[in-house]
């Protein structure tokens, strides 16, 4: 079953953020756009490259009024040490969520039971807590977080402009499409 246009289910997890431990719930996501980025585990190889990419794009997320949450199946205690020891992860200014009970990874369909890890999944969630984009793929392939920013902005645009769609490779400020009978066969 697709998670697109479904409400984020209730949850409560702990995270490491800005030098302290915090609690994150589904209510934490409401009132702003949110991006959940699931990763297999702390202290791995591709995960720090993605966190660094997210950190390098964090200004774009903030300009768009969105918060980023990194989620692994480790504890928030592990994330504290990871943040303190990894130069790439140390750049993160967003919450690093620990999901050792697999509450979130199961709810978002990215849990790998036989490994106790998460698949690489990315979810853009609107201010009402509704999932608008889903990307899940193999753990051997790291994501381009710049593409996640593009998808966030496209989701925001279409939310603000009902009846319009963002074509392939659409970037903020570019022309969109208004589907109609007149467009059929002309694109």
Swiss-Prot record:
Q: Give the primary localization class.
A: cytoplasm
What superkingdom does the record give?
A: Bacteria
Catalysed transformations (reactions) = a hydroperoxide + NADH + H(+) = an alcohol + NAD(+) + H2O
- In this protein, which residues make up the domain named Thioredoxin? 2-157
Reported EC number(s) for this entry are 1.11.1.26
Its annotated compartments are: Cytoplasm; Secreted
| Cited InterPro entries | AhpC (IPR017559), AhpC/TSA (IPR000866), Peroxiredoxin (IPR050217), Peroxiredoxin_AhpC-typ (IPR024706), Peroxiredoxin_C (IPR019479), Thioredoxin-like_sf (IPR036249), Thioredoxin_domain (IPR013766)
Keyword Cytoplasm listed? The answer is yes
What is the annotated signal peptide range for this record?
A: none
MF terms in GO:
NADH-dependent peroxiredoxin activity; thioredoxin peroxidase activity
Entry annotation: catalytic residues: 47
Please cite one Gene Ontology biological process associated with this protein.
cell redox homeostasis
GO CC annotation: cytosol; extracellular region
Q: What class of enzyme is it?
A: oxidoreductase
Subunit info here reads:
Homodimer; disulfide-linked, upon oxidation. 5 homodimers assemble to form a ring-like decamer.
Q: What does this protein do?
A: Thiol-specific peroxidase that catalyzes the reduction of hydrogen peroxide and organic hydroperoxides to water and alcohols, respectively. Plays a role in cell protection against oxidative stress by detoxifying peroxides.
Family annotation (PANTHER family)? ALKYL HYDROPEROXIDE REDUCTASE C, THIOREDOXIN PEROXIDASE
Look up the further comments and give them: The active site is a conserved redox-active cysteine residue, the peroxidatic cysteine (C(P)), which makes the nucleophilic attack on the peroxide substrate. The peroxide oxidizes the C(P)-SH to cysteine sulfenic acid (C(P)-SOH), which then reacts with another cysteine residue, the resolving cysteine (C(R)), to form a disulfide bridge. The disulfide is subsequently reduced by an appropriate electron donor to complete the catalytic cycle. In this typical 2-Cys peroxiredoxin, C(R) is provided by the other dimeric subunit to form an intersubunit disulfide.
Protein family? Belongs to the peroxiredoxin family. AhpC/Prx1 subfamily.
Name assigned to this protein: Alkyl hydroperoxide reductase C
Question: What organism, scientifically named, is this protein from?
Answer: Pseudomonas aeruginosa (strain UCBPP-PA14)
